[in-house]
């Protein structure tokens, strides 16, 4: 079972029956991009909070995103000791009665079997992950597995567009959306 640590988010605004979460991963700032693309700030303009699924490379990414909303993040394989010392490998947040897990690389390259195990072991209704730089939405039964892709370094280049994702959560449902930028 993966070790789960918690970051504390400020209390979410109580008003509204739907929470919108901005999902982002694999920003690689400043190694592969000088900054987060401006389009990300437009897409995330009215989110309740932001989830970053790792490979920030520099903590300034969190500072930049926090201009919009609170940020919940995990470290990725390209994040150095400073980031690994501040962020957990696995994180989660409960929105209404939905438990949303965050992890950079839950063996996504080997299919959903390992991701399904992680979701079941941790009681996740949804698992946000990164690492592949390629966006995807997959449902396995009633479990959601979503990769927002990369806004700075999509793979494969020239075929895959830079992307982020939005997750709209209500008491009744979770609705994922990939947004190309």
Task: List where the protein language model places each region.
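N-terminal active-site segment of His-dependent metallophosphoesterases
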Residues: 2-71, 79-89, 160-162
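Beta-strand-turn-beta hairpins that frame and shape the catalytic cleft
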Residues: 12-22, 92-101, 139-145, 169-177
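Active-site neighborhood of phospho(di)ester-bond hydrolases with catalytic His/Asp-centered motifs
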Residues: 23-25, 49-55, 72-77, 101-104, ...
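Pre-active-site segment of Zn-dependent metallo-hydrolases
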Residues: 27, 31-43, 102-103, 107-119
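Active-site environment of divalent metal-dependent phosphoester hydrolases
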Residues: 28-32, 56-61, 78-84, 107-112, ...
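Conserved beta-sheet core of the metallophosphoesterase superfamily
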Residues: 72, 110-175
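Helix-adjacent hinge/juxtasegments
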Residues: 72-110
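Well-ordered alpha/beta subsegment
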Residues: 180-181
């Amino acid at each position: 079972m993966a070790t789960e640590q918690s970051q504390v988010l400020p209390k979410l605004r109580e008003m509204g029956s739907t929470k919108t979460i901005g999902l982002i991963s694999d920003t690689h700032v400043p190694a592969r991009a000088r900054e987060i693309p401006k389009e990300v700030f437009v897409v995330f303009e009215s989110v309740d909070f932001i989830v970053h699924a790792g490979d920030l490379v520099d903590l300034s990414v969190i500072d930049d995103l926090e201009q919009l909303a609170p940020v919940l993040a995990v470290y990725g394989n390209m994040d150095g000791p400073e980031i690994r010392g501040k962020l957990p490998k696995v994180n989660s947040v409960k929105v209404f009665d939905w438990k949303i897990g965050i992890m950079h690389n839950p063996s996504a390259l080997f299919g959903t079997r390992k991701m399904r195990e992680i979701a079941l072991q941790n009681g996740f209704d949804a698992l946000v992950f990164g690492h592949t730089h390629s966006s995807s939405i997959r449902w396995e039964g009633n479990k959601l597995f979503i990769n927002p892709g990369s806004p700075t370094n999509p793979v494969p280049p020239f075929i895959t567009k830079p992307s982020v994702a939005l997750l709209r959560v209500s008491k009744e449902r979770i609705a994922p959306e990939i947004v190309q930028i």
